[in-house]
Structures are given as C-alpha cells and as structure tokens.
Amino acid sequence: DDGEEKLTWAEAAALVNSIAAQLQAEGLGKGQAVSILGTTTVRYALVYLAAIIAGGCAAPLTTSATPQQLAAMMADSGAGHLFIDHIKWAELADSGVGLPALRHVMIDAADESAGAPFLLDWMANEGVAPTEVVTGPEDPYNIIYSSGTTGTPKGIVHSRQMRWYQMAIGEESGLGAVGQATLLSTPMYSNTTLGIFVATMAYGGTAVLMRKFDCARWLELARQHR
C-alpha cells in the first residue's frame, strides 16, 4: 500500500512473477543486477522483489545522487535493465549525462518519446511463471550504494544469507504477524528500510510505503494501521 495503489498478497505475487519472467526472457543472468531509480511505490517494491525471484540482484539507486553519480552506479552494477519513473527520467535527460546502454522500463507510465515501455505493459502475460533459479547463501541479494559524499558512491553487495538472517530477526520481532502493518517512511534504497521491508514480506505482513516523509501523513497512517 503506497497511498495510491494497494495490492493483496495474491495480486502482488502474480505481478512479481510476471516481472521476473520477463527479466529472464530478456536475458537476466544469475546474480546480475537490476537497477531501480525512482520514488518509493508499490511498483518499485514489485520490481525489487522480482529481480530477486528471477535469480538476479536488486540495485536500488539513490534518488539524491547527481546524474554523473547515477551513471557511474549503473555502470558499476553491471545491470542490463533500468526501471525508472518519469521524474528521474526527465532529470537525467535534461542533464545531458551519457548513461550506460541499459533497457529502460518506466515504473509509472509509458514514455513513447524514449521508446521505454510501461512496466505493466512490458511484463510477461498473467500466469507466466519465472524459471526457478537455484541460489545459495553467498549469492547476491542486493547492492546498496554509499552516499558518495567523499567521491563516487561505492557498491555494497549484500548476500542472500545476510538478508535471510535479517528475516529471522524480523520474525522474532513480530514482523509479519497477523494484523500487523509495517510503516516505511524512508526510501527503498536505504538499507535500514530494506532490512525491515524484506522481513515484513518474508512472513506475510503488510508493508505501507510512504512516497515521501511527511509528519502529518505519517501520524495519520500510524493511527490508521495501528
């Protein structure tokens, strides 16, 4: 739930599978990164999960980074796809900075001028399941980039074992318990956010995503979901 779009578990699972299947159809390799850039939304979260289900590695990029830094992160990650929203797409286009040759998919709506398809049009047909990829504890789960305040942002690779450990801690903390919602008010490129998000999803919880932090809205959501 991001305030504009709400999905049940069944709906989310079907969409994640369709996105993952299309990533595989377009050649996503085991452990290969999938770059994601944009405001935190339900669809952003779906792409993040689909990259992992497809056997790849999610690479959420910092929205506050400069175009030059973003281009460097995309190249460093080794991604073949960039999932992006219109706000960030316009910023990058206006900057004139050359970007790596990635397949662009729009998270929020199609961009015919750039030839970038809309996520829900691009993904595989309903009912198409991704091929199961055998992964181990040391295989990459996601790449988190440093802030870059002292230079080019550095990629920090988290293994699947590391995230599994966080999921186990989340279970002990009650994340995913019946009737409990997790309110996430920080961006999904933040490791703090992701640690709580993946644990919530691992145990069938409800994740409530804030596109941008707003104190009054946060209090309203906290009252609504407590």
What is the predicted role of each segment?
Residues 13-18, 137, 156-177, 185, ...:
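Conserved structural elements of the adenylate-forming
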Residues 81, 87-137:
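ANL superfamily adenylate-forming
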Residues 6-10, 141-165:
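Conserved AMP-binding A3 loop
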Residues 67-68, 75, 95-114, 202-206, ...:
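Conserved adenylate-forming
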Residues 126-145, 152, 175-181:
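Conserved pre-ATP/AMP-binding loop-to-beta segment of ANL
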Residues 3-5, 20-68, 187:
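Conserved AMP-binding/adenylate-forming
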Residues 1-8, 114:
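AMP-dependent adenylate-forming
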Residues 164-181, 189-226:
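Conserved AMP-binding/adenylation subdomain of ANL enzymes
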